[in-house]
């Protein structure tokens, strides 16, 4: 009777463990969607950092510089002059770094925040890959001191926060018509006649939203409260 009772207990535990695995894998499928969303968010974040169209300056000041459009980015400024007939000759770009004195605080801080956002996003992807691997292999425990789902969610939300600060600060600078004292060799005036939001800011906004959404999905992952994940036989 004792052996039969033990065998029955073992069978029940195995069924319970199998049910737990099915539940966890089903729940993890939502996290796979979150992983896809986070991947797109990271890609858009990297693209926005490299784009130059953060601020669109429309210049019509013949006495100071040739008329045209200046695209002000985080790492360079590109000027498109209207008086050139050849498009390839109309574009002139100048690179700058964090150490250039003429850069305003918003661009300096934005450079660091965008770099931090990309690093946090990559770390978040690494954690979610580890978390999904553990779930599908059935080795993730409810009482883990460092839950990779939670870690990934926090990292993605932090990355979203960094990008959001950059977006809001640059949007404020555009709306308040703040200028930049570029070197005279750039032939760009301190302020344009018209300043508008560029496509890079829109891409960054979408990246921030996707990273926030993926982080929320990762944090929503829960374990079954009434199932023991690793029963001892």
Named regions from a protein language model:
Residues 88-93, 134, 175-186:
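Peri-membrane helix termini and adjoining interfacial loops of integral membrane proteins
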Residues 1-73, 79, 134-145, 183-202, ...:
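Intrinsically disordered terminal tails
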Residues 81-96, 160-167, 201-216:
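Juxtamembrane/interfacial segments around transmembrane helices
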Residues 30-40, 106, 110-126, 130, ...:
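Physicochemical signature of membrane-embedded alpha-helices that form the seven-helix bundle of GPCRs
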């Amino acid at each position: 009777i004792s052996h039969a009772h033990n065998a029955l207990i073992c069978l029940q535990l195995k069924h319970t463990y199998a049910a737990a695995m099915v539940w966890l894998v089903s729940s993890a499928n939502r996290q796979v969607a979150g992983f896809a969303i986070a991947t797109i968010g990271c890609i858009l974040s990297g693209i926005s950092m490299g784009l130059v169209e953060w601020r669109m300056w429309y210049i019509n000041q013949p006495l100071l510089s040739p008329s045209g459009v200046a695209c002000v980015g985080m790492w360079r400024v590109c000027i498109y002059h209207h008086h050139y007939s050849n498009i390839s000759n109309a574009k002139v770009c100048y690179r700058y770094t964090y150490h250039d004195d003429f850069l305003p605080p918003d661009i300096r801080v934005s450079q660091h925040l965008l770099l931090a956002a990309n690093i946090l996003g990559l770390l978040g992807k690494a954690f979610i890959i580890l978390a999904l691997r553990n779930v599908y292999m059935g080795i993730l425990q409810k009482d883990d001191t460092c839950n990779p789902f939670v870690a990934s969610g926090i990292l993605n939300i932090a990355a979203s926060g960094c990008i959001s600060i950059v977006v809001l600060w640059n949007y404020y600078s555009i709306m308040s018509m703040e200028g930049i004292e570029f070197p005279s060799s750039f032939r760009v005036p301190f302020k344009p006649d018209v300043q508008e939001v560029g496509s890079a800011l829109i891409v960054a906004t979408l990246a921030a939203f996707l990273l926030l959404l993926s982080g929320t999905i990762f944090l929503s992952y829960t374990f079954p409260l009434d199932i023991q994940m690793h029963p001892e036989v």
